[in-house]
Amino acid sequence: MPINQKIPTWFAVPAVFAVLSVISYQTLIVPENLEGAKNVLTMAKTIPIPVAGPESIEFDPKGEGPYAAVVDGRILKWRGDDLGWVDFAYTSPHRGNCSKTEVVPTCGRPLGLTFEKKTGDLYICDGYLGLMKVGPEGGLAELIVDEAEGRKVMFANQGDIDEEEDVFYFNDSSDKYHFRDVFFVAVSGERSGRVIRYDKKTKEAKVIMDNLVCNNGLALNKDRSFLITCESGTSLVHRYWIKGPKAGTRDIFAKVPGYPDNIRLTSTGDFWIGLHCKKNLIGRLIVKYKWLGKLVEKTMKLEYVIAFINGFKPHGVAVKISGETGEVLELLEDKEGKTMKYVSEAYERDDGKLWFGSVYWPAVWVLDRK
């Protein structure tokens, strides 16, 4: 056979592998497109923060803030462009070896923040220590709940308060893992997540929902007749009825197009949910097949799991769902991650501004929609 006819054969094998690699990457790794999404998060203003991971943001009863729960165990308060971020509170007295970029368990890891309007107290879900509270002046938070029905609260995540009933509801995402291993909780299929009802008057902590897979965000609806909680791995939003003829029962309220984190109620009664990222095929397979999820848990470092699920391109996504039907009302994204990454929370203020937190990135963002 002439040499010029053999040359294509020499190139065939690497060419085929190259094509397969591109196809595999496009098929398995690239995040899925979100139909109807508005690529407007690129227009948000970035407010840098000196510590990574403002996972939850909150405003006090006076409207001041936001307050941000960050990776080194502190809650910081934004005092405007002139004063910047200042210390407000912290969840652990152990401050000596705390890192501004990585979780140190002894320092605590504050997550969901909720102010009680009538007292000014700030309730804090700490991913290592439990449910905590600090007064309006800040400082060291006190532990409120670290056990419910004989099981340790390992991963307090987000909560909400019914001020009329003096009851606080919060998620315990796992009784096996703490915050650092959140993605392993989501992909392993481990079902030990709970919703806990804490009665402030009797000091009783009671489990009202269980058998959940990494239940992450939680919020009460506008009339406090039900609460919703979302599972990060399955993308399901569960509803638990607190009042009315269905009280004590649960159902599926919605399914969102990504991996959900915190939930915030709007003044109109709808919900914003921060999405860590859009889905891709590799993420779907890991979550769907429990054996694969457990294999990933045992063999892969957490940072690699995060990279694969994000499609090696961190980006920003948030979804607004109806407070009545659960249907998707709005999808906002930063498709290329040019401005916003790893969105953990979307918080809508009455002035029309949307504030965003991030579980990993050292920034919060604000989008003026008026």
Curated annotation (Swiss-Prot):
The reply to whether Cytoplasm figures as a keyword in the UniProt entry is no
Q: Which residues are glycosylated?
A: N97, N171
Kindly give the Pfam families that the UniProt entry links to this protein: SSL_N, Str_synth
- For this UniProt record, give its keywords in alphabetical order, as a comma-separated list: Glycoprotein, Signal, Vacuole
- PANTHER family for the chain: PROTEIN STRICTOSIDINE SYNTHASE-LIKE 9, STRICTOSIDINE SYNTHASE-RELATED
InterPro entries named in the record: 6-blade_b-propeller_TolB-like, Strictosidine_synth_cons-reg
Protein name as it appears in the record: Protein STRICTOSIDINE SYNTHASE-LIKE 9
Species of origin = Arabidopsis thaliana
**Underlying gene:** SSL9
Where, per UniProt, does this protein localize? Vacuole
Q: Which residues form the signal peptide?
A: 1-26
Mind telling me which GO cellular component terms the entry cites?
cytosol; endoplasmic reticulum; plant-type vacuole
Please state which protein family the record places this protein in: Belongs to the strictosidine synthase family.
Starting at the broadest rank, the lineage of the source organism is: Eukaryota, Viridiplantae, Streptophyta, Embryophyta, Tracheophyta
